[in-house]
């Protein structure tokens, strides 16, 4: 993608991960921290787990674009709403729509897969109920890009860091997205105010 990203000099050593760990106290959670949809797939299934031992929940699923706006142009999530019993699983099938063929074929495209849990109505008065939502990254990976995944020559080795002034330029010449989840100094001091960076 040949884009560069700047961050402060304290971020000299980066732990590069493809996705940040999912931290959630929701009852309904997906079975993964990211979704990669390969261009040669007809569908992909995400399992939703209800961790509550006593209550059933409704689970609503949809996709958003990279600006967090609901997007129904390229993919559909079915069923959009389902009931999941206590300590049980549900499944959401994500399928491409015809417009998915118009997505860039030389690089990944970023979307977000969302799940909102809807608790059963409480029979207790004056009870505040929250509909918690989990959002994970959803990457569309075209066939031509998927062919570049080589475990013997990882694409991550092509990433470079270059000092410039009081900062660092992070160059990602690959067609893949990546997340930098942590950074620190040469003395292995983790930057306390470091925020995840998503780099195209």
Residue ranges and their predicted role:
Residues 72-101, 189-200:
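Intrinsically disordered, low-complexity Pro/Gly/Ser/Thr-rich segments with frequent PxxP/GP/PP motifs
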Residues 48-52, 168-174:
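Asparagine-centered strand-capping/turn motif at beta-strand->loop junctions
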Residues 53-69, 174-190:
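Short acidic, flexible loop segments centered on an aromatic residue
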């Amino acid at each position: 993608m040949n884009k560069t990203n700047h961050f402060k000099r304290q971020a000299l050593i980066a732990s590069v991960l493809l996705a940040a760990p999912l931290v959630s106290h929701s009852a309904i959670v997906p079975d993964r921290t990211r979704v990669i949809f390969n261009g040669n797939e007809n569908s992909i299934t995400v399992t939703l787990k209800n961790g509550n031992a006593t209550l059933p929940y409704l689970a609503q699923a949809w996709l958003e674009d990279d600006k967090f706006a609901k997007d129904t142009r390229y993919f559909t999530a079915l069923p959009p709403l389902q009931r999941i019993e206590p300590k049980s699983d549900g499944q959401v099938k994500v399928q491409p729509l015809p417009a998915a063929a118009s997505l860039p074929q030389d690089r990944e495209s970023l979307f977000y897969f969302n799940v909102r849990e809807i608790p059963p109505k409480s029979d207790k008065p004056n009870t505040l109920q929250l509909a918690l939502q989990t959002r994970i990254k959803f990457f569309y990976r075209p066939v031509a890009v998927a062919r570049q995944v080589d475990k013997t020559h990882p694409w991550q080795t092509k990433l470079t860091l270059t000092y410039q002034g009081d900062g660092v330029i992070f160059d990602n010449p690959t067609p893949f997205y990546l997340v930098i989840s942590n950074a620190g100094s040469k003395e292995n001091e983790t930057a306390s105010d470091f925020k995840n960076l998503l780099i195209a």
